[in-house]
Amino acid sequence: MEKFVLFAPLIASLIAGLGWRAIGEKAAQYLTTGVLFLSCLISWYLFLSFDGVPRHIPVLDWVVTGDFHAEWAIRLDRLTAIMLIVVTTVSALVHMYSLGYMAHDDNWTHDEHYKARFFAYLSFFTFAMLMLVTADNLLQMFFGWEGVGVASYLLIGFYYKKASANAAAMKAFIVNRVGDFGFLLGIFGIYWLTGSVQFDEIFRQVPQLAQTEIDFLWRDWNAANLLGFLLFVGAMGKSAQLLLHTWLPDAMEGPTPVSALIHAATMVTAGVFLVCRMSPLYEFAPDAKNFIVIIGATTAFFAATVGLVQNDIKRVIAYSTCSQLGYMFVAAGVGVYSAAMFHLLTHAFFKAMLFLGAGSVIHAMHHEQDMRNYGGLRKKIPLTFWAMMIGTFAITGVGIPLTHLGFAGFLSKDAIIESAYAGSGYAFWLLVIAACFTSFYSWRLIFLTFYGKPRGDHHAHDHAHESPPVMTIPLGVLAIGAVFAGMVWYGPFFGDHHKVTEYFHIAGAHHEAAEGEEAEHATAEAPVEHAVADTATAEGEAAAEAEHAEIAAPVGGAIYMHPDNHIMDEAHHAPAWVKVSPFVAMVLGLITAWTFYIANPSLPRRLAAHEPALYRFLLNKWYFDEIYEFIFVRPAKWLGRVLWKGGDGAVIDGTINGVAMGLIPRLTRAAVRVQSGYLFHYAFAMVLGIVGLLIWVMMRGAH
């Protein structure tokens, strides 16, 4: 079954992409959609029936050369099971939604066949992500990692007639190459130090890596910290963290279903998954974890500030994704990997619903995306309105404080903020502020879109209509997850340390528990006279057990938490004001948004006029694009022109053209003049040749 889940989307993609002329475009759409729903059902069966014990499922010997051996295998553990349901559920619903959304696309003419290609790309995207999350070694993961990058390039640039779409696709691809270079260096370093790319073998050697110093860039580094940092650079690119985030908003150039798939289930979650998968390494790399916390918290704050002033409905949600990913990285950085995965799971439901809801709004408004041209749509598209409301309740964290009752984001985001309080004061305060901003821009979206009087094109508003059932049914399914996912899975993900340990089969935990029980049992039954053991024997056994525990501890579970990692327990005992602070931030953001856009709609304009520098700073996304244009893009273009004109044009082409059009014609003209046709000229040349040969022979004889 696991192999079917992995390879079925690939087969469907190939049939739809290469064989749609034979089976028909409509059949290609239904084939890919049906296969994804079947994979989704199997994934849920695997998730619900999984006992937590990791399994290794071989597929084939992939790379065998010299001493290097890498097989293609499926690693099925709790992390994999979670990602399987996230990827296949969202992808199946996006496929279904796309049947309606892509039915009539104004970017294509009636005689252009684009639907089969689109669905083939979607299915290939899904396969690449499944390849990534089921990987049993870093090479296999990198294959899926790059496959996701290629698929995102194809889908972001799907409207290839638009220059902006082509530019966005190139930007996403190039920025991710920067992160991928760091990921590759990390893989090379791990293989160089451990001799393997297989996860269990790497994890087995992590304690030794933590005690190893290596020379890199003219200074000594702790191996575990350096490798953790390099791997996280790859995660920064894929998950659009600060400094490598600039591609994510531009990715909105692709069709809206693509945005839902990228932001909720596939590409951007890959970085979070990578850090959680490599938790045994990060538990021995404290400096790398601190770096993750700083980047994650700063990204959450940065993206939330930019989202305050965005007017494109899709870009608002895009920046919310960037911000929420920062939350996940903070959780992973402080060592509560289960909380990071918890938020990844709940976020998939409400973020996919928000994007698909935005697509429904855009569909109703004839592809208008500027929220300033919306208004009063809640009566026109009531199903979409309620779906977006539920998504907003979830992302802003609506729930009952100090209880486990609330929408999905209420429980998962609060778990991260409480963990941040226990692990990093810097991250805690930035996340609370970001929660307030998240509430503000989320309710701003709701108020501008669904409340007030119609603005902009009144013809579009008058003819606005609800989306067909094929588009609203996925919204309803996702709404169920956005409401109940947090309450259902709070316990095994964060609620109790013992439950989390059992659920994720945390490496070393069961071994230690078993040893403790055996020791207690032996102590209770052993006679007093046998309680005193031979000192040397006891010390030898203790040393052997310590050595065994040190080697085995990071291996055998979905995640690993060091015995000294007590952040989750400390988070559970955080003060009440810490647990209530996200709710207060949410209410403050809601009240501010209501004041700005319902009670006093002229206030935002006046405030922007009063603080123009701050407004432009946020509207221009902290000027990251302009800074990168000045520091990287222009110098790169200048260097490219120099190498093109001076290197390729002047040196390479100049040399070849100079020889071909200058030297060779002159030599041929000289040769023509030598061929005079007179016999005595040829005889004289022969005599000169013979004389020359004789002189050469005599000179060699003299030596």
From Swiss-Prot:
GO terms for cellular component: plasma membrane. The keyword Cell membrane applies. It catalyses: a quinone + NADH + 5 H(+)(in) = a quinol + NAD(+) + 4 H(+)(out). It is a multi-pass membrane protein. Gene3D superfamilies: 1.20.5.2700. One of its GO terms (molecular function) is quinone binding. PANTHER family: NADH-UBIQUINONE OXIDOREDUCTASE CHAIN 5. This is NADH-quinone oxidoreductase chain 12. It comes from Paracoccus denitrificans. The gene is nqo12.
